[in-house]
């Protein structure tokens, strides 16, 4: 009787008490798991050294049991048991027992190679702080131990492979700088020679042609002929003014000065020459623009033009006098007895090296310095020519005197070359500039050569060289005329014949130099176009395809570095250059072989579709340089809106089907299922296929729903 009420009393127990007992059971299980893990760690850490006779063997083939996996398995077992208790009769369920395979007295033994090794222990944080790195190395040593260690210690450079590889690459780049620099300077020197010889050969011929053409009324007077006329007037007027200067008096005045005064005077002349060069081209541009922009045959026009012409003549006279002083000072240095003056003047180049190497340089500043070096190199050649003519005239053209001057000339030129090599090598090293940057500079001045041959050129080629490199040939030409007029006199037929032969020789050199220079310019620009096409096709095709927004960004392109002149440099345009491309050539090279076949197939397909659809113009996403002086301004025909599609399908299904197939075949970043409108005759007349031999800029378009518009 007593058992029945007790049973019913247990069955009618409050559910809250049962839930609390389950929570207590879960807490106890988790505590037991935690205690078992802690005991296991403690037993591993604090275990005594095992006996070598009875080592414990570890079965590596068995499944590794971690504390985390053990706890998860126990929780799953506990939940299953609790669920069965709630569903079944609580009395029939046996007591829950913790399934554990870990025994509290079990110890893990680690067998070491050495029988006398200490057990594995984890160092405390205090021990880690107290123990200094390389504690076993920084130990006091005796005399013999230190001696033996110095003899037998070893090291390996492969432990820092990346750093030493980078050092070797920098050394190779440092040694490549003179070669890359000389390629640029040589091509720039050809341009200076072309601009200088132009004043003695083609400018007089153009002047005579314009005068006779205007007198005989064969052709109209143009602005180019006005510029040629003004240049001839400036050269003739300044030459007549320079003839009043006594060069012998200048020579003796300079020679009577001391060594230090000559050194300071020569440095002052160099600084003044650079300042005059930066100002001279602006004066000439102002004169030429005033003579061609104002209303002609008016009083104000003649007053302004004459004022600018007088200023230009005065500038040319002063600059020519400055150059003559430089040549006279250099001649005094050559004729000095101990040549101390010449050595001191040559040391001025190393002072320039000190002032430029340790400055921060960007690519634009390096281009400015390289162009200035081209001008200085041609300038020193002109001065040496004048010194040689003066000395040979003084000794009645004795060959022995010329052989005595050759070592001094070689020393001056060699010092100039050596200082330029060191200067550019250390500037590129300290500023982390790639050696391929000189290819960018060469392409930039080659672009000037091609642009000057265009029919729509805005200036003469000699003026473009002056703006680019700061080289003004007019003062040098006036100095050459002054020296040659003192050296040779045209008082007999023999002198006239020699003068004619010399002029024909200069004329032949000018033509040959122009042909070589133009051929090199075409080669450089063509190479730039090929590299640009490969870069755009291989590196940026995937990114342009993935851009599926309505306004696609401008296609990245390899831009030419464009500078207005040598002393006023704008910021370089964004884009990839040849040096950036060649630095990533290893990434691009493996895919070139596979892409050549694909590109040839794509070109053949494009040509076939272009001839088949001569009345249609498809939008171009990226076209590699096709025409340098102008951008491609042609726009594709507008696409119809969505509400006109049913009508077009019913009216002309044949044209719609053809246009849909052609649009699906073109490489487009966004594929839309829209049908193109029939192309009218006006759209077909505006369609012009771009030749593969031309150069054009890259154009990106955005694709709205109503049509195609170009992003400016």
Swiss-Prot record:
<dbReference type="GO" id="GO:0045724">
    <property type="term" value="P:positive regulation of cilium assembly"/>
</dbReference>
<feature type="region of interest" description="Disordered">
    <location>
        <begin position="596"/>
        <end position="712"/>
    </location>
</feature>
<dbReference type="GO" id="GO:0036064">
    <property type="term" value="C:ciliary basal body"/>
</dbReference>
<dbReference type="GO" id="GO:0005789">
    <property type="term" value="C:endoplasmic reticulum membrane"/>
</dbReference>
<feature type="compositionally biased region" description="Basic and acidic residues">
    <location>
        <begin position="596"/>
        <end position="619"/>
    </location>
</feature>
<feature type="compositionally biased region" description="Low complexity">
    <location>
        <begin position="1"/>
        <end position="21"/>
    </location>
</feature>
<feature type="compositionally biased region" description="Polar residues">
    <location>
        <begin position="656"/>
        <end position="667"/>
    </location>
</feature>
<feature type="region of interest" description="Disordered">
    <location>
        <begin position="1"/>
        <end position="22"/>
    </location>
</feature>
<dbReference type="InterPro" id="IPR008010">
    <property type="entry name" value="Tatp1"/>
</dbReference>
<dbReference type="Pfam" id="PF05346">
    <property type="entry name" value="DUF747"/>
</dbReference>
<feature type="transmembrane region" description="Helical">
    <location>
        <begin position="305"/>
        <end position="325"/>
    </location>
</feature>
<feature type="transmembrane region" description="Helical">
    <location>
        <begin position="470"/>
        <end position="490"/>
    </location>
</feature>
<feature type="transmembrane region" description="Helical">
    <location>
        <begin position="497"/>
        <end position="517"/>
    </location>
</feature>
<feature type="compositionally biased region" description="Low complexity">
    <location>
        <begin position="675"/>
        <end position="692"/>
    </location>
</feature>
<feature type="transmembrane region" description="Helical">
    <location>
        <begin position="402"/>
        <end position="422"/>
    </location>
</feature>
<keyword id="KW-0472">Membrane</keyword>
<feature type="region of interest" description="Disordered">
    <location>
        <begin position="44"/>
        <end position="66"/>
    </location>
</feature>
<protein>
    <recommendedName>
        <fullName>Protein TAPT1 homolog</fullName>
    </recommendedName>
</protein>
<keyword id="KW-1133">Transmembrane helix</keyword>
<comment type="similarity">
    <text>Belongs to the TAPT1 family.</text>
</comment>
<feature type="transmembrane region" description="Helical">
    <location>
        <begin position="222"/>
        <end position="242"/>
    </location>
</feature>
<keyword id="KW-0812">Transmembrane</keyword>
<feature type="transmembrane region" description="Helical">
    <location>
        <begin position="196"/>
        <end position="216"/>
    </location>
</feature>
<feature type="transmembrane region" description="Helical">
    <location>
        <begin position="379"/>
        <end position="399"/>
    </location>
</feature>
């Amino acid at each position: 009787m007593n058992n029945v009420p007790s049973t019913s009393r247990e069955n009618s127990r409050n559910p809250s008490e049962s839930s609390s007992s389950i929570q207590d059971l879960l807490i106890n299980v988790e505590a037991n798991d935690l205690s078992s893990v802690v005991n296991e760690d403690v037993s591993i850490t604090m275990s005594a050294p095992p006996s070598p006779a009875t080592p414990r063997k570890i079965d590596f083939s068995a499944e590794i049991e971690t504390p985390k996996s053990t706890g998860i398995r126990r929780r799953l077992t506990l939940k299953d048991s609790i669920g069965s208790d709630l569903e079944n009769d609580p009395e029939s369920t046996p007591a829950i027992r913790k399934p554990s395979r870990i025994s509290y007295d079990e110890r893990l033994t680690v067998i070491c190679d050495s029988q006398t090794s200490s057990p594995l222990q984890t160092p405390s944080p205090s021990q880690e702080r107290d123990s200094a790195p390389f504690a076993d190395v920084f130990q006091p040593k005796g005399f013999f131990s230190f001696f033996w260690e110095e003899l037998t210690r070893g090291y390996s450079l492969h432990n820092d492979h990346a750093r030493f590889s980078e050092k070797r690459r920098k050394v190779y780049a440092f040694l490549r700088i003179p070669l890359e620099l000389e390629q640029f300077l040589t091509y720039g020197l050809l341009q200076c020679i072309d601009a200088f010889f132009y004043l003695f050969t083609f400018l007089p011929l153009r002047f005579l042609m314009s005068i006779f053409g205007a007198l005989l009324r064969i052709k109209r007077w143009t602005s180019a002929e006005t510029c040629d006329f003004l240049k001839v007037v400036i050269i003739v007027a300044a030459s007549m003014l320079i003839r009043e200067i006594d060069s012998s008096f200048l020579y003796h005045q300079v020679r009577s000065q001391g060594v230090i005064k000559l050194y300071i005077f020569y440095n002052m002349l160099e600084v003044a020459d650079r300042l005059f060069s930066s100002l001279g081209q602006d004066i000439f541009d102002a004169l030429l623009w005033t003579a061609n922009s104002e209303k002609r045959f008016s009083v104000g026009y003649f007053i302004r033009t004459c004022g600018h012409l007088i200023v230009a003549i005065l500038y040319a006279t002063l600059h020519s006098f400055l150059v003559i002083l430089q040549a006279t000072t250099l001649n005094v240095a050559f004729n000095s007895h101990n040549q101390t003056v010449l050595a001191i003047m040559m040391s001025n180049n190393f002072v320039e090296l000190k002032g430029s190497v340790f400055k921060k340089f960007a690519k634009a500043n390096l281009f400015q310095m390289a162009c200035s070096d081209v001008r200085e190199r041609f300038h020193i050649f002109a001065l040496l020519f004048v010194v040689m003519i003066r000395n040979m005239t003084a000794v009645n053209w004795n060959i022995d005197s010329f052989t005595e001057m050759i070592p001094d000339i070689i020393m001056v030129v060699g010092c100039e070359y050596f200082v330029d090599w060191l200067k550019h090598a250390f500037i590129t090293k300290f500023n982390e500039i790639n050696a391929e940057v000189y290819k960018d500079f060469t392409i930039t001045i080659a672009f000037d050569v091609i642009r000057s041959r265009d029919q729509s050129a805005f200036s003469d080629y000699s003026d473009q060289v002056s703006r680019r490199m700061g080289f003004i040939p007019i003062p040098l030409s006036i100095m050459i005329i002054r020296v040659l007029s003192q050296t040779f006199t045209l008082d007999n037929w023999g002198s006239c014949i020699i003068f004619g032969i010399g002029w024909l020789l200069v004329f032949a050199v000018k033509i040959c130099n122009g042909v070589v220079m133009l051929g090199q310019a075409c080669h450089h620009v063509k190479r730039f176009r090929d590299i640009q096409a490969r870069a755009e096709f291989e590196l940026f095709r995937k990114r342009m395809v993935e851009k599926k927004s309505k306004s696609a960004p401008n296609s990245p392109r390899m831009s030419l570095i464009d500078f207005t002149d040598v002393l006023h440099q704008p910021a370089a345009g964004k884009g990839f250059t040849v040096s950036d491309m060649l630095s990533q050539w290893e990434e691009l090279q493996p895919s070139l072989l596979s892409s050549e076949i694909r590109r040839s197939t794509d070109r053949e397909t494009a040509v076939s579709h272009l001839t088949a659809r001569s009345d249609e113009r498809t939008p171009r996403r990226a076209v590699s340089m096709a025409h340098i002086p102008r951008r491609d301004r042609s726009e594709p025909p507008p696409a119809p809106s969505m509400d006109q599609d049913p009508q077009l399908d019913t009216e002309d299904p044949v044209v719609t089907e053809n246009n849909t197939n052609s649009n699906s075949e073109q490489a487009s970043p966004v594929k839309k299922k829209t049908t193109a409108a029939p192309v009218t005759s006006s759209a077909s007349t505006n369609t012009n296929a771009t030749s593969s031999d031309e150069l054009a800029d890259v154009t990106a378009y955005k694709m709205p729903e109503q049509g195609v518009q170009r992003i400016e």
